Amino acid sequence: MWEIEEHRRVDKQLSGAVPTEVLKRYEKWKDIARVSGPLGLRAIKGFHDEALSGERKGHRCSRLGLQWRVIYRVVANVLLIQIVQVTAHDYRRP
């Protein structure tokens, strides 16, 4: 089992004008990540899981809808997934 750790900003980002479909997909994404880890996320084509580059190198991204993304980092030696941001497709750092 993988541990999911959310950044403190994520609650604030999700409490705004986020569609309920995106919230449901985010919860399902967390369930899959908790059980199967990054390999399980990559196996599901609907998430379009991919590695990021540039200043986000070392992070990964999964789609929660056409516009919404979850950006996360994997710490493999402790089976930890750190969720950095849930955003409306804006990869710039806050």
Where are each of the predicted segments found?
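Basic, Lys/Arg-enriched alpha-helical interface segments
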Residues: 1-68, 74-94
